[in-house]
């Protein structure tokens, strides 16, 4: 077998598309980009969702600039421009999400369907297919109809399971003949921990001692309940698809946010143990039920009665409820032991892993190049680790029975206060993307991991959760004073030549 060499740190030379390009991958491998509804569409023509509610109620949490998704890049009006970018990239895949409140404005299908919203997605999907671009469609990318949050606190209540199923049923009915890749819920870990634990995300529930501005919540218990209902809602939808829609010939699965974890001190058994706990609490929390029908034993032991349990029927429903996994990967962290003050009033579910996470290890070594600079405090800077994508893919193959995998997000931001010229010359993004693609190619070739596609985040600059417009993630540039155009940045031109060498 050929030995593939990938650099772990700067300066990267993988930007040379003569050496690394799409022909390094199998001929059926899909390359493209990703987006989500709240971040790109704008509010025109849809019902309110919890990100509308959250960003207006807590503008300081929506971004340092108080930015929100009210208009953003207005892809509701300019979706054809999005397709033009994909066409220019020669992309063969595009991941986007359907806004639940655009097609069912009041959350429950029984309250009526918005035909104009359905027409919007029909237009987008057929436009993609005309250009030979495969749609990857996310049903839920965090933008729950506000009515369902108001009525029963959304995923905190089991009522969500049937409402989500009815919404998915409508999507399969309308779009299933054209859509062959469905993603149920984006980043299963995120809404429970960020929406109901730290309250950094919508709906913004937490214990009063965690953040006094939270309108209600319990950061120690609610994340586990929300995660449990997400798993059941996901599984119910997969079951529906398999019972009623297999004739459409598509595949369905969840999206996981992944990280890799390394010991803060690799000679210290406590750091090593903390690292293993993080893998179970971050990945196993969802992959345990999805593969074995049960939560990891370490979680059962640690969380105790705060962790819901599955009935035998539920366990069977959740177990094996995916045809493929969408894996998002951005960075890796060092783990060291940290106390878990279960009985304190400011306890959160995220403390249960008993780990503190950093980007610098015991010997003062940074894990890799700068990912994102923290304006307020440089000790909060994030650093990235391209080899982490290799480790994550290898881990999923070995621990979770060699699943079919699509990388559904991978990308890096640049500062939003750069001028247009600086933003267009985004060489840091080329470094990030090419170094991860090198390690992705390496793990496929060396470990025979079943990865069949890579979708970079993001198609264009957009509203970033918690950051507003203070960062840019796009491979194409959007001028916030005139959002009609999307211009390929250097990284977009690089990706274009990577896809079509």
Swiss-Prot record:
> Could you tell me what this protein is called?
Myrosinase MA1
Q: In which tissues is it expressed?
A: In vacuoles called myrosin grains of a certain class of cells, myrosin cells, distributed in the cotyledons and the axis of the embryo as well as in different organs of the growing plant.
Q: In which broad location class does this protein mainly occur, judging by the first location in its UniProt entry?
A: other
Spell out the GO cellular component terms annotated for this protein, sorted alphabetically and separated by semicolons.
vacuole
Q: Where does this protein come from, organism-wise?
A: Sinapis alba (White mustard)
Q: Please describe what this protein does.
A: Degradation of glucosinolates (glucose residue linked by a thioglucoside bound to an amino acid derivative) to glucose, sulfate and any of the products: thiocyanates, isothiocyanates, nitriles, epithionitriles or oxazolidine-2-thiones.
Similarity comment: Belongs to the glycosyl hydrolase 1 family.
A GO MF annotation of the entry reads: thioglucosidase activity
The entry's other comment says:
It seems that the absence of a catalytic proton donor in plant myrosinases is not impairing the hydrolysis of glucosinolates.
Q: Where is the catalytic site?
A: 409
Q: Name one GO biological process term.
A: carbohydrate metabolic process
Instruction: Write out the catalysed reaction.
Output: a thioglucoside + H2O = a sugar + a thiol
Tell me which EC number(s) this protein carries: 3.2.1.147
Q: Which EC class is this protein assigned? A: hydrolase
Residue numbers binding Zn(2+): 56, 70
Q: Which residues bind substrate?
A: 39, 141, 186, 330, 457, 464-465
